[in-house]
């Protein structure tokens, strides 16, 4: 079995490829942190160091927020690229469509997501760090 190498550009490529929004959310909010948590600290630092190219969509903010979030969880220095202005939204994006889930996202989103303006349902950010097994759309 070959080991998956976590490369953030994979998620930017998924955005550019036109994946459905639900698949992008699942990949960024579940798959990315699961794979990140499974890496040794040195490999995590390597992932953080390489910025994904910009897609010029709101997904750039969500990717940056997720990386900021997992970097803080693992006590890594924050990569400079997450502070690029293009990785912030001028208008807050609340991902869930269901009213009570939107309220939870607004009230309980972690600081990294609030800062970037992309608010997922915080229940998607479980302590396990995403899904237990690799997910392929």
Question: Where do the language-model regions lie?
Answer:
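Charge-dense, extended regions
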Residues: 74-137
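Charged, helix-prone or intrinsically disordered regulatory segments positioned adjacent to compact structured domains
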Residues: 2-81
């Amino acid at each position: 079995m070959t080991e998956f190498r976590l490369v953030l550009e994979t998620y930017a490529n998924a955005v550019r490829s036109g994946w459905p929004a639900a698949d992008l959310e699942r990949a960024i909010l579940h798959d990315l942190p699961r794979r990140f948590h499974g890496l040794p600290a040195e490999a995590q630092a390597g992932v953080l160091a390489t910025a994904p190219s910009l897609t010029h969509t709101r997904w750039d903010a969500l990717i940056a927020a997720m990386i900021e979030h997992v970097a803080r969880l693992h006590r890594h220095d924050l990569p400079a690229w997450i502070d690029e202005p293009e990785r912030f939204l001028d208008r807050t994006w609340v991902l869930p469509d269901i009213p009570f889930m939107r309220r939870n996202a607004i009230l309980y989103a972690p600081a990294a997501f609030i800062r970037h303006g992309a608010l997922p349902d915080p229940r998607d950010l479980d302590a396990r760090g995403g899904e237990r097994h690799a997910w392929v759309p």
